[in-house]
Amino acid sequence: MTKDLLLELGLEELPAYVVTPSEKQLGQKMVKFLEDHRLSFETVQTFSTPRRLAVRVKGLADQQTDLTEDFKGPSKKIALDAEGNFSKAAQGFVRGKGLSVDDIEFREVKGEEYVYVTKHETGKSAIDVLASVTEVLTELTFPVNMHWANNSFEYIRPVHTLVVLLDDQALELDFLDIHSGRISRGHRFLGSDTEILSASSYEDDLRQQFVIADAKERQQMIVDQIHAIEEKENISVEIDEDLLNEVLNLVEYPTAFLGSFDEKYLDVPEEVLVTSMKNHQRYFVVRDRDGKLLPNFISVRNGNAEHIENVIKGNEKVLVARLEDGEFFWQEDQKLNIADLVEKLKQVTFHEKIGSLYEHMDRVKVISQYLAEKADLSDEEKLAVLRAASIYKFDLLTGMVDEFDELQGIMGEKYALLAGEQPAVAAAIREHYMPTSADGELPETRVGAILALADKFDTLLSFFSVGLIPSGSNDPYALRRATQGIVRILEAFGWDIPLDELVTNLYGLSFASLDYANQKEVMAFISARIEKMIGSKVPKDIREAVLESDTYIVSLILEASQALVQKSKDAQYKVSIESLSRAFNLAEKVTHSVSVDYSLFENNQEKALYQAILSLELTEDMHDNLDKLFALSPIINDFFDNTMVMTDDEKMKQNRLALLNSLVAKARTVAAFNLLNTK
């Protein structure tokens, strides 16, 4: 016989960004609890609102499954003494399992007999097991916790109610300072405390109190209501997924409505209006069917449609206050002079250990010119890079960006165009922030990409130079994101610039404001970002092998990893890797530089390998390179089968090591083959 279990935790309002991850976590913790305690079940369903986290288990067994376990003990010769009685070792073993020597039997394992005991454990009732089910709540982890009242414990928010039901039976349990029952809280304004009659009636009981407990249902209600408004008003609404997920975790009973604002604000840049609505007010942006921005918005109320007209007016009033600010800054900022703003950046701190933003820009200007040369930009593009690098942070001192910091770069582009800057310069000001996330949009222009690279390189090298190096998950200056942006941009634009050479040359630049340091740590940090770009689906040994190659060109490293993944499926992969690995391992024994002396060869296999290496021409096609290297496998194996590399003749030994080293020098441009696993 099975039953349904309900566990609901009622809390004060949770931050929206915490709700969905916590709901998912709760489901996972419950599944683990049931599996660890041998309670079988059919399904686990989770629920969440800003004021509750809940999980329901359907088809829960009324008793644990019985457990039978075999335990292996000491060998028979240790388990029995000279008289054939059980030794202290055997007695201690069975006692530790809660059994006696009468339970011992001997089983043969690989030709030797060992003590074995079998332990049977009858399953407990579900009621007894569930006495500790609040463990799943204790084990939840949150980004931040808090104290309340005089309690010593911490949790994400103060806890008010705990409901634990097995079908319609309320279980009496305690969590923190709360005793469980069947009372849950309804909507803060429209509902009241209510009894949950049974685990199966949970959603319906709360619905009567204006709470939609199922987040998916709540989300669909919002989407359906928005679509209904779209149809009625003949408009188009951008349903941004991140905004939708945030809004559904701000409300327990959603009602969408259409608001409006004065058309005069449409003269303000669209990005300002969208940021005001979406980022600051959590409103959905409204356009006409052709995509033109309209003086409207859609918001979602936490409640029903009663007195909705008052809610609409209140939301319109709040939005207009923000739009007034945007309009004011738009007009005032146009009176500013870019040169004056750049000069004022001397007084703005980039970081107290590194210097001012002006000094940061000064270094970026030099780096960008070097990069523009390496990337073979045209003279016109180089001039645009130089100009952009000279001014690109000016918008940080505008009123608009001070109020709406999400618009940095975006407003820089607009103000630059208004000031008569070239479109390429203006676009670069916006694009230098890209990508803004691990998989975010990349710059579209070469000028913008070079400026983005220069800005990110100086940021990375500057922070590392003063010892501000990320550790663990701690990365307050977003250096991982910046470095990920570097490798993505280099790969996307096909700039095959070796990163080791690039970083070394950057360290060779001279600045009055800062001396770069910690080059080795920087290279290791960059390698870690390339490994992340390769992806965890590529086996670890392949990732390590290509990162230890002598190729520091991002695109070639990525191609080599894919080529090895593909080759690893071939029948000849194992034997080819093993022969190359043997060559790599022996080449490590080279103690000093020696040229290969053909006259010292003693057999045809040495000569054949020598000629094969001379003929080996590797290109930037990593798939073709692997074909060529794998084709050498029979020749390499013949060499090893017929040649003693580590001979007593020192001259002969060094010559053979030099021969292998010449092979390894070429092969290492693809990967460090001795790091590849063939087992």
From Swiss-Prot:
It is found in: Cytoplasm. It catalyses: tRNA(Gly) + glycine + ATP = glycyl-tRNA(Gly) + AMP + diphosphate. One of its GO terms (biological process) is arginyl-tRNA aminoacylation. It comes from the Bacteria. InterPro entries: DALR_anticod-bd (IPR008909), Gly-tRNA-synth_bsu (IPR015944), Gly-tRNA-synth_heterodimer (IPR006194). GO terms for cellular component: cytosol. Signal peptide: none annotated. The keyword Cytoplasm applies. PROSITE patterns: AA_TRNA_LIGASE_II_GLYAB (PS50861). It holds the Pfam family DALR_1. Belongs to the class-II aminoacyl-tRNA synthetase family. HAMAP family: Gly_tRNA_synth_beta. Tetramer of two alpha and two beta subunits. This is Glycine--tRNA ligase beta subunit. The gene is glyS.
